C-alpha cells in the first residue's frame, strides 16, 4: 500500500503510524525489515519525511479468529424479530479479537439470540455500536440487515438517545454544560484517544446529579460516538472518570475499571417506527460506591 506525506519534518516511523492503521511498533518492525520504502528507497526509522514523499508499506496479515456460541449469562432487556437490547456487564469485550477469542458479547449473542445481522462481518454479527470492555450498560443489537442499516443510520444522524452515568473526580464548577472538542488517536500513545485538532467532531453534554466533595455523579449524553469519548472528554476538562486506568489518576475509587454505565438507550424501532426507550440501573459495584460516597466512606 502507498500513502503520500502531507506534513513534513517528522520521523518516518511516526509518520507511517499517523498516516495508516499501523501501530508505532509495527511500523518500526516493517522499517527495520526493509518493508517500508520512501520514494522507492528503504530508509531508517529516524529519517525525516518531506511533504510529497510516497511511503510504501505492507498490510499485516489478518489473524483468523474462530468464534463459537457460548452459554454465557446475558441480560436481554428487550427482544423481538428485529432488535435486541442487551445490558452488557462490566468486564465483557463486545466482539472477538486476537486477544479475546471467547467470553465476548458476540459469543453470548450467538448462543442466546442466534439470528443476527451480517453487515459488520462474521466477527461482529448484530453489533451496531460498542461500549468499552470495562463500561457496563445498554447496547442495541440488530437481528437482520434491514434493522442494522436503519439503526446505524439513526446513530450517524445523531437521532439515537444515549445517556450514561459516571462517577468523576472533583467538583464540577457548573451543574450542566457541553463539551465540544474533536477526538482522534493520541500521538503520544497509539492505544489511546485524545482531544486533537486533527480529530473528528465530538460533543458530550453533562448534567450534575450529586456532589460528594472529591467526586461527582454526572449524567452524560452523547451527541457523537467517538472511541472513548466520555472518558477522553471528562479527562480533558479535568474531571476524569473514577477508576479509569487509561485516562485518570492512580489514586481513585476501587472497582473493576471505570465507573461508567450506559444507563439509557432510545431509538426509533426499524420496523414499527415507534420511538422506544430503555433504562438499566448501574451495577452493584457502582451503587455500592455511591452509597459509600454519600456516607463519606471514601474508598481510595
Task: Locate predicted features.
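RNA pseudouridine synthases
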Residues: 1-300
Amino acid at each position: 500500500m502507498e500513502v503520500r506525506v502531507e506534513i513534513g519534518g517528522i520521523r518516518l516511523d511516526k509518520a507511517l503510524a499517523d498516516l495508516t492503521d499501523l501501530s508505532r511498533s509495527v511500523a518500526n518492525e516493517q522499517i527495520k525489515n526493509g518493508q517500508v520504502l520512501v520514494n522507492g528507497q528503504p530508509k531508517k526509522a529516524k529519517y525525516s519525511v518531506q511533504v510529497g514523499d510516497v511511503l510504501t508499506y505492507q498490510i499485516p496479515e489478518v489473524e483468523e479468529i474462530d468464534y463459537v456460541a457460548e452459554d454465557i449469562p446475558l441480560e436481554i432487556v428487550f427482544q423481538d424479530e428485529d432488535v435486541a437490547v442487551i445490558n452488557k456487564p462490566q468486564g465483557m469485550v463486545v466482539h472477538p479479537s486476537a486477544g479475546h477469542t471467547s467470553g465476548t458479547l458476540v459469543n453470548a449473542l450467538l448462543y442466546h439470540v442466534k439470528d443476527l445481522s451480517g453487515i459488520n462481518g462474521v466477527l461482529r454479527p448484530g453489533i451496531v455500536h460498542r461500549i468499552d470492555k470495562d463500561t457496563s450498560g445498554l447496547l442495541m443489537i440488530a437481528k437482520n440487515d434491514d434493522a442494522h442499516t436503519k439503526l446505524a443510520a439513526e446513530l450517524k444522524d445523531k437521532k439515537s438517545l444515549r445517556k450514561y452515568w459516571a462517577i468523576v473526580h472533583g467538583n464540577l464548577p457548573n451543574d450542566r454544560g457541553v463539551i465540544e472538542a474533536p477526538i482522534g488517536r493520541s500521538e503520544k500513545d497509539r492505544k489511546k484517544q485524545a482531544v486533537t485538532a486533527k480529530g473528528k467532531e465530538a460533543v458530550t453534554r453533562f448534567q450534575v446529579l450529586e456532589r460528594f466533595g472529591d467526586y461527582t455523579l454526572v449524567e452524560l449524553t452523547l451527541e457523537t460516538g467517538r472511541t472513548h469519548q466520555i472518558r477522553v472528554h471528562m479527562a480533558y476538562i479535568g474531571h476524569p472518570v473514577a477508576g479509569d486506568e487509561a485516562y485518570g489518576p492512580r489514586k481513585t475509587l476501587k472497582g473493576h475499571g471505570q465507573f461508567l454505565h450506559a444507563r439509557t438507550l432510545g431509538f426509533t424501532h426499524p420496523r414499527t417506527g415507534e420511538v422506544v426507550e430503555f433504562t438499566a440501573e448501574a451495577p452493584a459495584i457502582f451503587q455500592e460506591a455511591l452509597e459509600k460516597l454519600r456516607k463519606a466512606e471514601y474508598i481510595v
